[in-house]
Amino acid sequence: GFPNDEVRYGFLNFLVPYYTDVTDDETGFHIAKFMRELSFGDVDAFMERLKVFFAGIPYELSNGTERHYQAVFYIVFTLMGQFVETEVRSARGRADAVVKTGDYIYVFEFKLNGSAEEALKQIDEKGYLIPYALEGRKLLKVGVNFSKEMRNVDKYIVIEE
């Protein structure tokens, strides 16, 4: 663990250049845009930015394992700050990421060489949206498939509940 958020975010900012070609001075710019897009409910723009982010990862930095892609997702989502929780435990499983904004709650599930449909099915079967049903915000589930071959997002599906 980290003694405080400042140390945690500093460490994660330090890691970004090792996993991507984003420089230290660009990190805040990217993260702010990610948050703005989700705050306005623009999942398509968010996912396109995520694709660009992944496309910038040099081939030699990508070892093609699911753990590598999870690490990059974790870094991006964690740098988004207090709006994001990763590996969110519920009664029947663990959602990969939950993003909360003023008007929206997004539950993300990621698959590597699976399908976006499988990811959505897991959200439904494990009841990942149930804990947020009474919060009064729009609930969106986002199933994302990541292609090991393409080393990027292959397909995503967004469904509003």
Where are the regions that the model predicts?
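Extended alpha-helical interface modules used as scaffolds for assembling large macromolecular complexes
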Residues: 1-118, 125, 147, 151-161
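Metal-dependent nuclease catalytic cores in nucleic-acid-processing enzymes
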Residues: 74-78, 122-142
